Amino acid sequence: MAPVPIYVKGGIWTNLEDQILKAAVQKYGTHAWSKVASLLQKKNARQCQSRWNEFLNPSLNFKPFSQQEDDKLLDLAKRIPNQWKSIGEMMGRPAQTCIDRYNILLAIDKDDLELAATTGVQIGEINPNNESLPAKADKDELLDEEREMLAEARARLLNTQGKKATRKIRERMLEESKRVAFLQKRRELKQAGVDSKIKAPRKKYSSQMDYNEDIAYEQQPLPGIYDTSKEDEQTEKLLKSFEKLVERKGLLDRKSDEKKTIPQKRRQGEQITSSVTKLDSVLTDEYKKPKLELTPATLKGSKRKINKTTSILHLFESLPSPKNDFEIVLDDLDEEMESTDAFNTESSYVNGKYPLEALISSTEHQSENKAMEIMEYIPTVFQIKTELQVPSPIVDPKNEIDRELNRIISAKENGNPIYNSTEVNNYLEEIINSASTTEVPSTVLHPKLETSLKTITPATEHELLGMERKVHELRTALEDSVKSHREAVSQLSQDFEEKLHPTVSGLAYQYYTDYMKYRNDHKTMQEETQSLAEQIKLAQRSQ
């Protein structure tokens, strides 16, 4: 096993760590630095807090000090000496910036009173004030550990659920996976021929309700005056058949059930029937009415067509004789219909049966007579066209449409004029009058549209191909002219990123370090010169 690398917490901050720190502060706030530091591999909680308070806080002021701020800084340093965090909060600046500015303003003995400056660092030493320096620039590609740290921080910061909700979701998923595994095992056992039932879950407390067996807030109906034992048997039968179906095939598997035929279903239902024995009290049985027994159905098996007229007549015959002493006075139309019906029924009644053909012929004869009385024929101008072929007449007409067609065909063959009813003639005349009065819209085009259509000539296929060829040539020429410039620009940018930028950054850092060394040496030389001048003056005075 490879040795685990030991990281030293600290070092200069990178841009990636700054961005992760900002996002973590937005989520966890400025009081949970241990959670913030858990997202950064090379920083601890104190360093994260110092980095935020000294560099990344948007409320900090990094502008140059003014004269009023210098006076305020000196005043605060006298009032609360060595409490630079409090002074920085009062000034609205980082504590290290206030220390650096105070060291610049003071011109006293370095060994006694001067505080540690941020720039007094030699090459190779650990800078204790990395939190107040700008972040290091990102590299072209992130390292593996940085990429892993970024992925973990993104996953944790995007998670908006708490620990309890996450645990509940994990437990729910675990229960669902257990249930699916149990159902799969039960299905495999059923295929192997081993029947296993689903056990009820263990109750957490004694009064817990099992909603698969019991019904919440169920209220049993009070016994009534009617006997409902047959309905109870039917309900019990349906319940048992449903439980058996669920036990054998499942709750949602109904495709195979739809393919069953009716006799198979009936046979299966007869096998499941079971009598329900019930102890009824004597008191309730005395007040119950007997069961309603209906006559059994006369038609069983295949269905056949029933004539409405014969069924109505049979129903009238089955009615009992009236018990009233008065006679029912019918209207004239009802009396005529009754007389005709009585005549037809007497003539058609043979050996206690009503033939279907006699009833149909009587109804057709009545409808034909009624239609002939209502219709009044008048000559009309509409005739069958001579070029059309006359169809053959219908041998056995069944309705008015067939009879009307036979009448028109016979009139055409005999050369007689064809008559229509007054209603049809009036309707046709209205259609002709409405068609003659309608105005037909003009199809003349607008003059401007007509001139534009005449002047514009569509381009031919040869012209379109020529235009497409020219566009392609211009595009290739433009790409060739830009290609050399694009390569030069990419080469320059690559040289700048690989060579010039690192060199300039190193030179700038070296210049900054040398300049700070020179400034410290110059300050030391000035102090030594002043001390020598004072000693010379004292020597001259003593002489």
Curated annotation (Swiss-Prot):
Subcellular location field: Cytoplasm; Nucleus
Domain HTH myb-type, chain residue ranges per copy: 1-58
Alphabetized InterPro entries for the sequence: CDC5L/Cef1, Homeodomain-like_sf, Myb_dom, SANT/Myb, SANT_CDC5L_II
Source superkingdom: Eukaryota
Residues within the DNA-binding region(s): 33-56
The keyword Transport is annotated on this UniProt entry: no
Myb-like domain boundaries: 59-106
One CC-aspect GO term: Prp19 complex
Disulfide bonds listed in the record: none
CDD domains documented for this protein: SANT, SANT_CDC5_II
Coiled coil is among the record's keywords: yes
Annotated region (Disordered), positions in chain: 256-275
Keywords: Coiled coil, Cytoplasm, DNA-binding, mRNA processing, mRNA splicing, Nucleus, Repeat, Spliceosome
Gene Ontology biological-process annotations: mRNA splicing, via spliceosome
An example molecular function term from Gene Ontology annotations: DNA binding
Principal place of residence: cytoplasm
Coiled coil location: 135-188, 459-541
Family: Belongs to the CEF1 family.
Functional note: Involved in pre-mRNA splicing and cell cycle control.
Quaternary structure, from the entry: Associated with the spliceosome.
Protein name according to UniProt: Pre-mRNA-splicing factor CEF1
Underlying gene: CEF1
